[in-house]
């Protein structure tokens, strides 16, 4: 895993400033602590930070073709690089390394921008074509690896993280009111937007081409849900799922450095580890982390799976100094991000890095296999709509009349909404919903965001799905929104914070293409989520794991806010700086904090959002050059004592 950064000036007579390129690249040094490299030519500058995984001796970047006219910087892994390399050699290409990076260089020579169709993996890369003066940026199909860009006067800047772009003086630190509204609705800012005006996320499965002063984007892949009604038997689907899982895991075990897996004891990570056992001639290293807090420790479940499968199991209990960690999290995410599971993700990544350089995880199992509660609720609501017909809307109107504190009122309200809006609303549950935002915002800020709809992205994705099955549509929405901008963003930043490469076998694009063809009835059956995944895991792990209810990857933030985070929260929310931003109603902020501290109500998610927002403001907006100044602090994260071994 690595970090990339660069600048392209359309005018070849306008050179890229080397010191600026070095600063952009150094901003992501945590992503690649092993080596750094640069390429500068007429109007182009490419920078790279390397975390060595494959071809340790000769895989440094930037890396070019035979005559140097093509240059590549690359973050990620091409898992089928050996297969593509063999094809390219047959076409007459000559290789001087064994790295997957060189496959990109020669692949571009052979197929141009369509080379991405050949690649199987997680990637974000830049290709410079010196002869054509063309820059190509590409991001993998699911958005596992991040890539940001900004058009600036006379050129384009890009990088693995926003902080690289902020090192360029032509990139303004101007925040967007609509993006802030989206954050308070969802916990994150959906692609292609960022909190910064002019900075964009390159969407997954997209290529960007910059040449002759023009920039164009094109999409090269999408998930195609078909409804899965092709007459095949359940056993046929089960057999094919087994084959896809076996291949996806085997491909991700290719490494020249120590490799293991993060294990929670849930269905997804247990599935990955079970197939790792099949693919390895020695017990795989597995790591689990729990908290010293009742109800937030999954180590016992993980140990049950690990012992049953014969793994080399390592369990640690985190004793987080969360008040010291949160400013570092704000720095690593670059923009407001409030999924509190970033905290346990950071600690499990840190624990894993003590033992391995590459860790496989179970991320992706929920989105395409109906693993979330909202999938079951969506399925129930659709059945009720079908059974009640017009009466469903009457039930919905009743829900509108009831306060949300009344049990079941929210589900009744959803019955009155169109299915696309009902599912979009599920993503905002527990955060600042429209009524809550109306109370939270100042009158001036309310006017600024009037007419903006943070949920439009979800409705658009709902209708873009090729299947009419409501459950298929809801899973497609999750795969194109929440999974990319929340789950994968969290995993990438927290693993890269400690220079750990995370790999997600359940997000293999061929496995996902298969999942999209599986009937929804084999994902959610008799009220049981992930039905087919559970079946493939049956007889591999104890029944207690198969039948275990999903618990999520949570942290005890309600108690942290009343305990170790209370002084910081009090200062961040009430010292006047937040009030002076003119965004919020000060009395509403005070009410939320007072009610939570006194246990009158639980506002943990909303308060967490406000805390992370204010930390971001202070790091990236209030302090000129703040992103760079925080580098040393973030670098110290690796030295913090955060976990103690329980067993090994």
How should these model regions be labeled?
Residues 259-268, 293-294, 340-343, 368, ...:
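Glycine-rich loop motifs involved in handling phospho/adenylate chemistry
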Residues 141, 347-405, 482, 487, ...:
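Active-site adenylate/phosphate-handling loop in enzymes that bind or generate adenylated species
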Residues 87, 168, 368-371, 514:
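Residues that scaffold the ATP/ADP-binding catalytic core of kinase and kinase-like folds
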Residues 330-332, 373-380, 627-628:
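Short secondary-structure boundary/capping segments
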Residues 162, 381, 534-535:
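Acceptor-binding helix/loop patch of EC 2.4 sugar-transfer enzymes
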Residues 1-4, 8, 23, 41, ...:
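Adenosyl-5′-phosphate
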Residues 1-333, 345, 349, 539, ...:
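Cysteine-centered catalytic environments shared across enzyme families
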Residues 334-339:
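Short, flexible loop segments at the rims of nucleotide/cofactor-binding pockets, characterized by
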